[in-house]
Structures are given as structure tokens and as C-alpha cells.
């Protein structure tokens, strides 16, 4: 009796079919610098160095955590790829870099070309929103490694910034203004807690007041906002001193990452509205407010620090991008390492 790779659980033909299904999604994301499309051994990108005096490449990698479990439970796979791109390119953008290209890893126990194509459709949409090219990726079929119908994702983004325009927070000083930019919801962090608080108690098709008519599942799967073009537009308008992408660790864990020692950010909770999904998690799960702030973005997906004289121009630039933003606090003198405090 002969044994084939398919008998062992790996279907090469299904993988080839997936490649053909994703090409139409990836093709529109390609930039002029891309020299080869999906399917080669490596993605080729010819950086236009003439645009820079001293180019610096910026890289980022991330996943979407257990938000995937919500996608599995809802059997919806066409937006989770947007989250994957967002988690990577937002990190690249907040140092001032333009995202250039993106690669993904998709691992599953039994490959479904249709399911994989839905995921990549979302990845391609995320790349379109970020203005970067989807130039490659890896699909791994790992029999017995994942539960049926489940998969894992990882993303990798590369951008470029002029060395003199790197946003590193070194110029932040007491008296500077903290501007918070609205998130779309939970984004892609804290889902282990959110699932425990909500999905262990309620079905995904339940509707709660405050969710804008959406079901619980729809609210939990709301894609992460991709701020890449917003960041670049804001930098064209004002000299932003620091950016923070608010991910795991929330405001207290992320804002200090780009502040110099001897400073602290003091944010006032009353200065910005909090989307209803956060109140729902807090109420249904009995989650302490401090834990909420240590886990979730609490309505602010991006934070920028600007000089007081640039505050109005910063708000105007963000409004022009269709974003809600608020002056949420200020920088004060601190002691030792930088900190962030949310005052209620």
C-alpha cells in the first residue's frame, strides 16, 4: 500500500488552489516598487532611495491574539486580516514611517482554500487602507496541530522613514498636549478577557443597547483602525513629538514607551467618550476599572503629543481625515521612568 502526503493530511493541490484564489486580492495592493507578485520564493521591492537623503527601514510583526476565536465562533473570516495588518503597520507608522510592504503567515490543521482566501481578502483590504503592498506570505498545513476549522495568523510589515523625521519622543517636555484619537472598539487586544466576560455569558447574535444595532459578534469583530495614512497626514501638518499605538497594556502601558524619563502623561477620563463595548465588558464581567485600563485601549487607539501651539492644527488635520480626536491630557514633570496616569 502506497502512502501520499495527502494521506498524511497535507493537500498540496488545495494549497495551489489557495494561491490562485488570493492573487486577485493581492494584485491591487501592489506598488510600482514591487518587482514580483505572489507565488515566488521571495518578494522583491525596489526601494526608491532617491526620495530620501538618509532612509531608515522600520519593521514590525504581530498577530491578532484570541480575537481569532471570535472569528471562528462567528464563522466570519473576511475582516480578521484587516486586524492583522493594522497591528503591524500601526506600530511601524508611529515612528513616522510609511508602510511599504507586508507579508503574512497562515497556519491551519486542514486547509480550506475558501476560508484562507477570505482571510487574505481582509489582509489585502488592510494593505489597501495602509497603502502598502502585499508581496508574499506562507501557508502551512499542520495536521493535528490546530482544532478543526481553526488557524493562526502572523503578519510582518516593513516601512521607511527619513532619519531626520523619526518620531522618537525625545523632544517631549512638560506643558506639551496629549491628543487622543478614537479607536473603533476593542481593536485586537484584551480578547481573552472580553471573551470571558461576554461570550461565556451571551450568544454572539445577542443585541445590546449602545452597540448601534450590531450584534455582540459584530461589535467584537469590528476591525482595528489602520492609522498609517492618518499619522503621515498629521506629520505633514504639525511636528508631532511622540506617538503611541495603544495595544496590550492600554494607555498606562503604551503612552510611556515614547516619553523621556522625568516626564509623566496625565490623562483625564472625562475628556473623551468611551465606546459602549468597553462598558459592556466592564459591567458583564465585573472587571475593575484599573484592570480595564491595563488591558484595553478604552476608546483611544492612537495618542499624539504636540506642543501647545500645534494643538489646533493637529485637531484640524485629524478632522480632515474623518477622525474623532480630543485633547485628553498634558505632559507634566515626573520622577524616574516615564509614566501615564488616567485621572477619573
Curated annotation (Swiss-Prot):
Keywords: ATP-binding, Cytoplasm, Ligase, Nucleotide-binding, Purine biosynthesis. Its EC number is 6.3.3.1. It catalyses: 2-formamido-N(1)-(5-O-phospho-beta-D-ribosyl)acetamidine + ATP = 5-amino-1-(5-phospho-beta-D-ribosyl)imidazole + ADP + phosphate + H(+). It is found in: Cytoplasm. Pathway: Purine metabolism; IMP biosynthesis via de novo pathway; 5-amino-1-(5-phospho-D-ribosyl)imidazole from N(2)-formyl-N(1)-(5-phospho-D-ribosyl)glycinamide: step 2/2. GO terms for biological process: 'de novo' IMP biosynthetic process; adenine biosynthetic process. InterPro entries: PurM-like_C_dom (IPR010918), PurM-like_C_sf (IPR036676), PurM-like_N (IPR016188), PurM-like_N_sf (IPR036921), PurM_cligase (IPR004733). GO terms for cellular component: cytosol. GO terms for molecular function: ATP binding; phosphoribosylamine-glycine ligase activity; phosphoribosylformylglycinamidine cyclo-ligase activity. Belongs to the AIR synthase family. PANTHER family: TRIFUNCTIONAL PURINE BIOSYNTHETIC PROTEIN ADENOSINE-3 (PTHR10520:SF12), TRIFUNCTIONAL PURINE BIOSYNTHETIC PROTEIN ADENOSINE-3-RELATED (PTHR10520). This is Phosphoribosylformylglycinamidine cyclo-ligase. It comes from Anaeromyxobacter sp. (strain Fw109-5).
